């Protein structure tokens, strides 16, 4: 058993996260979240974006890391980061058809400090299916 979850790290300051928004832009979804350094020292924090299929029809991991962004913040500073989720971010490889498939349906988008610490999450609905040969 691992001692620390994937993405775990320590800092000499504190960060607050707020306002997770996920918006649809064409075939992509854009995840945005604001991070504020609430401590007395400058520091860096990493926002990790995980995707979870709410109703999987094929075997896949419960939660998959699909993007991340490292932010350096001075004390009291707030920055908003944007992470683009393409159709491939929602896809799973189908060994029978030999292609990547992102099905339509409900997915949970989570913003996390590490794999075990989901700070905020929201559901999105993909309205179309996407396929791609490797």
Placement of each model-derived feature along the sequence:
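Intrinsic-disorder/low-complexity, polar/charged segments enriched in Ser/Thr/Lys/Arg/Asp/Glu/Gln
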Residues: 28-32, 78-82, 119
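Edge beta-strands of extracellular beta-sandwich domains
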Residues: 120-124
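Short coil/turn motifs at secondary-structure junctions
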Residues: 38-40, 54-56, 88-90, 116
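Short, hydrophobic/aromatic beta-strand segments
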Residues: 42-49, 61, 93-96
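Intrinsically disordered, low-complexity Pro/Gly/Ser/Thr-rich segments with frequent PxxP/GP/PP motifs
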Residues: 57-95
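Secreted, periplasmic, or luminal enzymes acting at the cell surface/secretory milieu
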Residues: 1-44, 48-52, 70, 75, ...
